[in-house]
Amino acid sequence: MRIGHGYDVHKLVENRKLILGGVDIPYERGLLGHSDADVLLHAISDAILGAIGEGDIGKHFPDTDPAYKGADSIKLLMHVMALAVGKGYAIGNLDATIVAQRPKLAPHIPQMRENIARALKADADRINVKATTTEELGFAGRGEGIAAYTVVLLERK
């Protein structure tokens, strides 16, 4: 059994899509990043990489590499999970929190869970995603960015 923790944050900007958990969410701004900037999937990837002792997503998918420009974070997550499977691990459970003042994310969470479960080859009941605000405090509360925290438990297959 291995435990990993992941955290990521991206700035909200004009003229970008807002993609969280592989879901294109209607909003006037999106997250800035080299890839699709899916902060939730990046935090999940980091948690899994941490659990298997393989560094972080910056090591595996550097933002200096043009190959990852605009990359689909679902595909990056699938690659990370393949590393975990290669070491003999499967998802025990995953718990993630998205921190965003706006937009309201609750209607999109079921699809996020499905996307994540599919990418991780895990049952959806092992995946939990929730969203919270910061009551207008800090960068997330001011609408400057979105953060995500993840804890993952990996079990030997």
Curated annotation (Swiss-Prot):
Pathway in which the depicted protein is active: Isoprenoid biosynthesis; isopentenyl diphosphate biosynthesis via DXP pathway; isopentenyl diphosphate from 1-deoxy-D-xylulose 5-phosphate: step 4/6
Any one GO molecular function term: 2-C-methyl-D-erythritol 2,4-cyclodiphosphate synthase activity
Xref: CDD domains: MECDP_synthase
Record EC number: 4.6.1.12
Record: residues binding 4-CDP-2-C-methyl-D-erythritol 2-phosphate: 8-10, 34-35, 56-58, 61-65, 132-135, 139, 142
Chain positions of site Transition state stabilizer: 34, 133
Annotated positions binding a divalent metal cation: 8, 10, 42
Record key words, sorted: Isoprene biosynthesis, Lyase, Metal-binding
Gene Ontology terms describing biological process: isopentenyl diphosphate biosynthetic process, methylerythritol 4-phosphate pathway; terpenoid biosynthetic process
InterPro entries named in the record: MECDP_synthase, MECDP_synthase_CS, MECDP_synthase_sf
Co-factor note (free text): Binds 1 divalent metal cation per subunit.
Protein origin, superkingdom: Bacteria
Entry-linked Pfam families: YgbB
Cofactor: a divalent metal cation
Chain's role: Involved in the biosynthesis of isopentenyl diphosphate (IPP) and dimethylallyl diphosphate (DMAPP), two major building blocks of isoprenoid compounds. Catalyzes the conversion of 4-diphosphocytidyl-2-C-methyl-D-erythritol 2-phosphate (CDP-ME2P) to 2-C-methyl-D-erythritol 2,4-cyclodiphosphate (ME-CPP) with a corresponding release of cytidine 5-monophosphate (CMP).
Assembly: Homotrimer.
HAMAP family: IspF (MF_00107)
Family: Belongs to the IspF family.
The protein's name in its UniProt record: 2-C-methyl-D-erythritol 2,4-cyclodiphosphate synthase
Organism: Geotalea uraniireducens (strain Rf4)
Lineage: Bacteria, Pseudomonadati, Thermodesulfobacteriota, Desulfuromonadia, Geobacterales
